[in-house]
Amino acid sequence: HVTIENGRSFFKALQEDRPIILITGHFGNFEIGGFLLGLLGYPTFSVARKLDNPYLDRFVSDFRGRTGQFIIDKNTGYEDVVSVMEKRGIMAFLADQSAGKKGAWVKFFGRPASAYKAMALMSLQYDAPIFVCYATRRDNKPLNFTMRMVEALDPRALPPEIKTVQQI
């Protein structure tokens, strides 16, 4: 059982002819969002590195793919990401990882952190709204989750003072 909170603008965006960017972090059950959307008929695509164990990598990829959640290889998948965006698909990212020296430096809990620029750039280039979400188990019961859409950013509605990738 999954309850979706604050999802009205997200489900409205699914009906538009635009790609969507989902952002979450390594918090709660970050896998349930892609699983749920795939079951509802909205396949999601995520960028990740291959697992070190090729047998486990194949098992996890096959399992995700059966429910409509597909992994694009972080090292070789640029064209695949472009294709998803051009076909108005859903890209999902775990955005709580350091982008290293080339990232956009932002404040995170008052401390400087290096964030990936790609999500903001793709949002602007492909007119894709960004939705920040997370899922947690509810009432400490198995297979009982709440998925929360916490924030939404639509590039069509950016205020004029937003001018940089860091601000997005």
What annotation goes with each model-predicted range?
Residues L14-E16, L39-P43, N75-I168:
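Non-catalytic C-terminal accessory region of glycerolipid acyltransferases
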